[in-house]
Amino acid sequence: MAMRFLNIGYGNIVSAHRIIAIVSPESAPIKRTVQEAREHNALLDATYGRKTRAVIVMDDGHVVLSPIQPETIAHRLNNKEDLSEEG
């Protein structure tokens, strides 16, 4: 089985099959999730200093911050051409 990767902005990629959720960072529960991940050293900031527009929750407990809108990431995830393949 080939691994598939998803571009989450500025050349950063994550493993597509390990994504649990792609959500907006605006709600209080998501802000708490991000803060808890930061406290447990499980936060990956892929924004390059830009505004966080999406929070990606991974199956291993890591939380990834992305500067790309959640809808755009979901569209890339559903569009097979936007996934890079390794293997």
From Swiss-Prot:
Pfam family, one: RemA-like
Organism classification: Bacteria, Bacillati, Bacillota, Bacilli, Bacillales
Residues in the signal sequence: none
Family: Belongs to the RemA family.
InterPro entries: RemA-like
Protein name per the record: Putative regulatory protein BA_4010/GBAA_4010/BAS3723
